[in-house]
Amino acid sequence: MSTARFIKCVTVGDGAVGKTCMLISYTSNTFPTDYVPTVFDNFSANVVVDGNTVNLGLWDTAGQEDYNRLRPLSYRGADVFLLAFSLISKASYENIHKKWIPELRHYAPNVPIVLVGTKLDLREDKQFFLDHPGLAPISTAQGEELKRMIGAAAYIECSSKTQQNVKSVFDSAIKVVLCPPKPKKKNTRKQRSCWIL
């Protein structure tokens, strides 16, 4: 019997977008009701995806600016990033390309990214938007466009509260590592060299 392959999966994104809730929902099938800012927490789960057993190491990171110098320490050895934003926070959506992509490309330039839109249950919650005037939800089309813009391997929307698509997020991360997408071929037209003798 072969040992399960270890995959290090690191969650990244602004504070309070639901990274920790997503991990807890996935590993324990529960939804925490209190917000507790994260420093670093690690979870581990043995998972079977498409007949492959993997030991999925889940690393949670803090999105707050106070941890900007500490957070990148968790990036070493990462196999995949779950880059999360809240579907009800335009600021967290915009920070994906303003803050998080530059940080990830600096510290881990070749690690694949799965883009995750969290709090899917609130996007259609009319009462939530009545209680929070001025907020506008992020659409699936906007998420797909951001995926293309940053070159993410996948984009998934989920709700940790209802558990909708939570398993799909982690299955997708595992599949990206086990079967990485083929890099797009650049248009390589033969260029002729000009030599001056």
UniProtKB/Swiss-Prot annotation:
Pfam families: Ras. This is Rac-like GTP-binding protein 7. InterPro entries: P-loop_NTPase (IPR027417), Small_GTP-bd (IPR005225), Small_GTPase (IPR001806), Small_GTPase_Rho (IPR003578). The modification Cysteine methyl ester is found at C194. One of its GO terms (molecular function) is protein kinase binding. Residues 195-197 form a propeptide. Belongs to the small GTPase superfamily. Rho family. The gene is RAC7. GTP binds at residues 13-20, 60-64, 118-121. Keywords: Cytoplasm, GTP-binding, Lipoprotein, Membrane, Methylation, Nucleotide-binding, Prenylation. PROSITE patterns: RHO (PS51420). It is a peripheral membrane protein. A lipid is attached at C194 (S-geranylgeranyl cysteine). It is found in: Cytoplasm; Membrane. GO terms for cellular component: cell projection; cytoplasmic vesicle; cytoskeleton; plasma membrane. GO terms for biological process: actin filament organization; cortical cytoskeleton organization; establishment or maintenance of cell polarity; regulation of actin cytoskeleton organization; regulation of cell shape; signal transduction; small GTPase-mediated signal transduction. The lineage of its organism: Eukaryota, Viridiplantae, Streptophyta, Embryophyta, Tracheophyta.
